[in-house]
């Protein structure tokens, strides 16, 4: 008798569980479907063009010495994580960029090497060069910027950079 009841019990449990789960869509499935639809409509090349244009403006404003305009490129909750300094948040960004300009840096050149991400956030990696008077290179390094989409515009959310030069003795 136990040989007959045990398989029937397991069979009925399996059928009951299978029937309860078939034809239903979980929240996770719906979120996945929505995310895939959003990702399909996201154009990384278009985002790259926007980032390239923003970087061109940033370099021009740096060359003009406009630290207030440089700070305006950042998201409301954006910050710069510069070497040998505390993190600079929105209210301190103009002062930070102003200090770089006053230190004798005349020009900043940014070269993007990679961009990856989605319609909400992008990660840009690249290299930079800093120039003094007479186009003299004073530093070369690398950077990572996390870009945040704020109301349809890409804004710098996290900006970190460091030199590729050997330490000075």
PLM features: residue spans?
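A solvent-exposed, acidic/Ser-Thr-rich amphipathic alpha-helical stretch
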Residues: 49-50, 67-118
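Positively charged n-region of N-terminal signal peptides that target proteins for export
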Residues: 1-4, 20
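Short beta-strand edge/turn micro-motifs at domain boundaries
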Residues: 25-26, 142-165
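A short hydrophobic beta-strand element
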Residues: 120-128
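Hydrophobic/aromatic beta-strand elements that line small-molecule binding cavities or substrate pockets
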Residues: 97, 110-115, 128-130, 142-148, ...
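Sec-dependent N-terminal signal peptides
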Residues: 5-13
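Short, low-complexity N-terminal intrinsically disordered segments enriched in polar/charged residues
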Residues: 19-68, 72, 168
